[in-house]
């Protein structure tokens, strides 16, 4: 692998609205590669995308008891996520108001309070400033109520925790919209819901966050060609040969009517899932009591047991693979780097051996050292490396696949649906919403585009 210089490419001081609008042409299917490299665009993303979107922070079962906490990020802003005594969840900026040091330096734990290690300012688990050393002697006029860290809005959807800095943003339910229908394929297969397998894997990829978000949103194309041949070969059951594993062709792709979310899935053919997750997980997902229960809850046998190798992104950076059950956030680290935080969910009432098999197979396939994850990372890193070149950034990328092949009135699947699983309709939706957020000054303007 070529070594990638992750220093930003600074080409200009600012972008005006018309220049940003020209970066993506949905009707022609053209993407300006500068959206993946420009530092000024990235700084605007932090302000207009990451500070105004609902961002995935974790799973409720990672903070079960009062005082349980995890630390994570919203964009590049560090945050603390804490279970409260009343079972609610608080999220606040992990930054002391005195000189800006982290309030909490651990990844996870249980606490009754958080104390800044620099000067000792202390905060309760809701993020309120409660103690200042030498307050009487040195801070006689300090009003502690005015010096708490910034607090985010928090909402959950079927176990997943989301937060948003913007008070004027739509609520999470509205933000997700019909995407909830597709999220339920993983999150609502049983009345017990899901639980997170302990542990979060974290690794850095020197590429722009949008490459990862787009692939999980829209790109079944690479899975049906040559990208993952080595991983498929490694995971084939003994009674299957590569010749028996023709790439599936039957499936659908979903594009959110508004919001940038997207998903895609094969229908009916289990062979690729067998190669990825093995016979035990595939059988659990497609036949027997668990799949029958899922079919009943989800309203159809197809949704409960026939959807294979599904991929999904909730805009901008929440991605997961139902059936494989990896869930991850793509934390941006500049225009040329992303930090991946991934965990695995399972049906809470699944047998222990099934939970263990999900854990084992996800580690083998989609983890920092996973055989499929390595293929994806290699491609993204090499693309980012090539985009260091002036000429490489000067010619648009093609996003025309399956253009004009969507319907808005599918009898089963909501949103804009492509009946060709090999489509870039969801990618066009992701970039259209990215453009919408980058050119809208506030949520009032965004709401007007719905």
UniProtKB/Swiss-Prot annotation:
Enzyme superclass (EC): oxidoreductase
Q: Which residues form the signal peptide?
A: none
Q: Subunit details for this protein?
A: This dioxygenase system consists of four proteins: the two subunits of the hydroxylase component (BnzA and BnzB), a ferredoxin (BnzC) and a ferredoxin reductase (BnzD).
Pfam families registered for this protein in UniProt: Rieske, Ring_hydroxyl_A
EC code: 1.14.12.3, 1.14.12.11
Please name the GO terms that the record assigns under molecular function: 2 iron, 2 sulfur cluster binding; benzene 1,2-dioxygenase activity; iron ion binding; toluene dioxygenase activity
Cofactor binding description: Binds 1 [2Fe-2S] cluster per subunit.
Could you tell me which CDD domains the record lists for this protein? RHO_alpha_C_NDO-like
> What does the record give as the reaction this protein catalyses?
benzene + NADH + O2 + H(+) = cis-1,2-dihydrobenzene-1,2-diol + NAD(+); toluene + NADH + O2 + H(+) = (1S,2R)-3-methylcyclohexa-3,5-diene-1,2-diol + NAD(+)
Keyword Coiled coil on entry: no
**Protein name, as recorded:** Benzene 1,2-dioxygenase subunit alpha
Which pathway does this polypeptide act in? Aromatic compound metabolism; benzene degradation; catechol from benzene: step 1/2; Xenobiotic degradation; toluene degradation; Xenobiotic degradation; xylene degradation
Q: What family is it from? A: Belongs to the bacterial ring-hydroxylating dioxygenase alpha subunit family.
A GO BP entry:
xylene catabolic process
Gene source species = Pseudomonas putida (strain ATCC 700007 / DSM 6899 / JCM 31910 / BCRC 17059 / LMG 24140 / F1)
Q: Which domain of life is it from?
A: Bacteria
Protein function: Catalyzes both the oxidation of benzene and toluene.
Gene3D superfamilies per the record? Naphthalene 1,2-dioxygenase Alpha Subunit, Chain A, domain 1, Rieske [2Fe-2S] iron-sulphur domain
Record keywords:
2Fe-2S, Aromatic hydrocarbons catabolism, Dioxygenase, Iron, Iron-sulfur, Metal-binding, NAD, Oxidoreductase
Question: Which residues are recorded as binding [2Fe-2S] cluster?
Answer: 96, 98, 116, 119
Cofactor(s) it depends on: [2Fe-2S] cluster; Fe cation
Q: Which ranges carry the Rieske domain?
A: 54-163
Q: What's the source species' lineage? A: Bacteria, Pseudomonadati, Pseudomonadota, Gammaproteobacteria, Pseudomonadales
Where, by residue number, does Fe cation bind? 222, 228
């Amino acid at each position: 692998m070529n070594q990638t210089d992750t220093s930003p490419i600074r080409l200009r001081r600012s972008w005006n609205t018309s220049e940003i609008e020209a970066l993506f042409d949905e009707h022609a299917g053209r993407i300006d590669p500068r959206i993946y490299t420009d530092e000024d665009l990235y700084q605007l993303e932090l302000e207009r995308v990451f500070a105004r979107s609902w961002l995935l922070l974790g799973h409720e079962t990672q903070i079960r008891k009062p005082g349980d906490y995890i630390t994570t990020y919203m964009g590049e802003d560090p945050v603390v996520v804490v279970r409260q005594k009343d079972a609610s969840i608080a999220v606040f900026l992990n930054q002391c108001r005195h000189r800006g040091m982290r309030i909490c330096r651990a990844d996870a734990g249980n606490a009754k309070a958080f104390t800044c290690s620099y000067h000792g300012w202390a905060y309760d688990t809701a993020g309120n400033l409660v103690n200042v050393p030498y307050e009487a002697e040195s801070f006689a006029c300090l009003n502690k109520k005015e010096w708490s860290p910034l607090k985010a809005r928090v909402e959950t959807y079927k176990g997943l925790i989301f937060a948003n800095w913007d008070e004027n943003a739509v609520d999470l339910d509205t933000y997700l919209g019909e995407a909830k229908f597709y999220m339920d394929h993983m999150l609502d297969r049983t009345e017990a819901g899901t639980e997170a397998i302990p542990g979060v894997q974290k690794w850095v990829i020197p590429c722009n966050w949008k490459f990862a978000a787009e692939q999980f949103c829209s790109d079944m194309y690479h899975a049906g060609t040559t990208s993952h041949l080595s991983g498929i070969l490694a995971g084939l059951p003994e009674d299957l040969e590569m010749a028996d594993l023709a790439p599936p062709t039957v499936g659908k792709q979903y594009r959110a009517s508004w919001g940038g979310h997207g998903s895609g899935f094969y229908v009916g053919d289990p062979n690729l899932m067998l190669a990825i997750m093995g016979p035990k997980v595939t059988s659990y997902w497609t036949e027997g009591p668990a799949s029958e229960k899922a079919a009943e809850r989800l309203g159809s046998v197809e949704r409960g047991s026939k959807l294979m190798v599904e991929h999904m992104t909730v805009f901008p950076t929440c991605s997961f693979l139902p059936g494989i059950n990896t869930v991850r956030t793509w934390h941006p680290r500049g225009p040329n780097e992303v930090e991946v935080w991934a965990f695995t969910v399972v049906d809470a009432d699944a047998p222990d051996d099934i939970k263990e098999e999900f854990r084992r197979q996800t580690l083998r396939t989609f983890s920092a050292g996973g055989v499929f994850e390595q293929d994806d990372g290699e491609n993204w890193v090499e693309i980012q490396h090539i985009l260091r070149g002036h000429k490489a950034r000067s010619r648009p990328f093609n996003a025309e696949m399956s253009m004009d092949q969507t319907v808005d009135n599918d009898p089963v699947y909501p949103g804009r649906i492509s009946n060709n699983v090999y489509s870039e309709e969801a990618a066009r939706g992701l970039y259209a919403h990215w453009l919408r957020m980058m050119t809208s000054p506030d949520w009032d303007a965004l709401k007007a585009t719905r």
